[in-house]
């Protein structure tokens, strides 16, 4: 039984939630998000809370139960607080800068890497070695942060590259003579 799915998601003041069949629409101060709940679970909205129940007790339905409840909770958190991922750049000459709707990364290649910032996402660089990806959709924020990190992932010898700010890089020892 899903321990996550059992708890109903409370809808805070200032947030409107509408459930139309399998579609959940959440509207808040930061924007509007929607999610289609899988057919294996049913969703209901009552008394200022959204609850999710499995239609059957199959393993697949129980898995979708917890997933759907977590997705709805993420929608509510996204339209109220938003999400952000912080990235750090380590390496001599490695830097980032935002120019209009483009993130320019100097990562040791013969050319600068240009990443076009998608709509609904804000990318800021408080310092040349720090990138903050923010938005209301948790999945998109994480995906974009992963795409930026992928341009030059951290290497294990000197730790050069782009890494998440809370990520620990296991260091390897170099060759011994």
From Swiss-Prot:
Keyword Ribosomal protein: yes
SS bond partners: none
InterPro entries (UniProt xref): Ribosomal_uL6-like (IPR000702), Ribosomal_uL6-like_a/b-dom_sf (IPR036789), Ribosomal_uL6_a/b-dom (IPR020040), Ribosomal_uL6_bac-type (IPR019906), Ribosomal_uL6_CS (IPR002358)
UniProt xrefs under SUPFAM superfamilies: Ribosomal protein L6
Gene Ontology CC entries for this record: cytosolic large ribosomal subunit
Gene3D superfamilies: Ribosomal protein L6, alpha-beta domain (3.90.930.12)
GO molecular function, one term: structural constituent of ribosome
GO terms under biological process: cytoplasmic translation
Pfam families recorded: Ribosomal_L6
Keyword annotations from UniProtKB, A to Z: Ribonucleoprotein, Ribosomal protein, RNA-binding, rRNA-binding
Job description of the protein: This protein binds to the 23S rRNA, and is important in its secondary structure. It is located near the subunit interface in the base of the L7/L12 stalk, and near the tRNA binding site of the peptidyltransferase center.
Assembly and binders: Part of the 50S ribosomal subunit.
NCBIfam families: L6_bact (TIGR03654)
Family: Belongs to the universal ribosomal protein uL6 family.
Identification of the protein by name: Large ribosomal subunit protein uL6
Annotated source species: Methylobacterium sp. (strain 4-46)
Gene name linked to the record: rplF
């Amino acid at each position: 039984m899903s321990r996550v799915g059992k708890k109903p998601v409370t809808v805070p003041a200032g947030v409107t939630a509408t459930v139309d069949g399998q579609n959940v629409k959440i509207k808040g101060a930061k924007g509007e998000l929607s999610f289609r709940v899988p057919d294996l679970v049913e969703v209901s909205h009552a008394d200022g809370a959204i609850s999710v129940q499995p239609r059957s007790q199959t393993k697949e339905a129980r898995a979708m139960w917890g997933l759907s409840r977590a997705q709805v909770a993420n929608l509510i958190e996204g339209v109220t607080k938003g999400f952000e991922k912080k990235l750090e750049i380590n390496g001599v000459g490695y830097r980032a800068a935002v120019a209009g709707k483009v993130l320019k990364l100097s990562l040791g290649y013969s050319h600068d890497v240009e990443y076009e910032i998608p709509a609904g996402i804000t990318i800021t660089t408080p310092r040349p070695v720090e990138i903050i990806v923010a938005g209301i959709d948790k999945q998109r924020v994480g995906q974009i942060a992963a795409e930026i990190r992928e341009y030059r992932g951290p290497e294990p010898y000197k730790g050069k590259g782009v890494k998440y700010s809370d990520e620990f890089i296991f260091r390897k020892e170099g060759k011994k003579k």
